[in-house]
Design a protein with these regions (language model features):
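Conserved long alpha-helical elements within nucleotide-processing catalytic cores of c-di-GMP signaling
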Residues: 31, 40-62, 69-96, 109-113, ...
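Secondary-structure transition/hinge residues
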Residues: 34, 52, 56, 98-102, ...
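Signal-transducing coiled-coil linker helices
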Residues: 1-34, 42-52, 102-104
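GGDEF/GGEEF active-site signature
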Residues: 89-159
Length: 195
């Protein structure tokens, strides 16, 4: 009888462990972009919410928005496979930033089809240095002559005088700078997009 009870308890514990492992896998999958392996928009919003709660404790936080220039044109002209390649190359150029090869406390996200975000807590590098690093990584990814052009926008959580901006203003400022850069660079002179 005791052996039967022990067996039942062991089976129950085993089922509970398996359920928890599966639940952890599904949770991780719900926060990851399948195509790129980067965190997705849901994970981005969770990180932003955490930053909002901890903002007073943070020295500063840099938000970079990155967009692939002309992804729709690539898709329409050369097909979805080429567009997917552009997205994957961009993600691979952003990933080293998160993997500690550049700075600590960095998170990278694919937040929409052609849009990415990078959040840097207590940044040591300027936005221009980040942009240069990511573009250099993208050049390494471009071995077949099919170049991808990126546009950048950024915002700091703290103004130069140290006061905090609201989370919505923080995101809006980065988005507005991205749009401004998009207008300035109507045609990307640096890159030929998928010749």
């Amino acid at each position: 009888y005791i052996a039967f009870l022990f067996w039942g308890l062991l089976c129950k514990v085993s089922d509970d462990v398996q359920f928890r492992l599966e639940q952890a896998v599904y949770e991780r999958m719900s926060l990851e972009d399948r195509m790129t392996g980067l965190k997705n928009r849901k994970a981005f919003e969770q990180s932003v919410n955490k930053i909002q709660k901890e903002a007073a404790l943070l020295e500063n936080v840099l938000l970079l928005f990155i967009e692939i220039d002309g992804l729709k044109k690539i898709n329409d002209t050369y097909g979805l496979q080429r567009g997917d390649e552009a997205v994957i190359r961009t993600a691979r150029s952003i990933r080293p930033v998160e993997n500690g090869s550049y700075e600590q406390q960095v998170q990278c996200f694919r937040i929409e089809g052609d849009e990415f975000a990078v959040i840097v807590s207590n940044p040591q590098k300027t936005p221009a240095e980040w942009e240069r690093f990511i573009k250099d990584e993208l050049k390494k990814e471009t071995t077949d002559g099919n170049r991808v052009c990126l546009k950048f926008g950024y915002s700091y959580l703290r103004k130069t005088d140290g006061t905090l901006v609201s989370i919505s203003d923080w995101k809006m400022q980065a988005d507005q700078m991205l749009l401004l850069n998009k207008e300035k660079m109507f045609h990307c002179l640096f890159c030929n997009i998928f010749n």
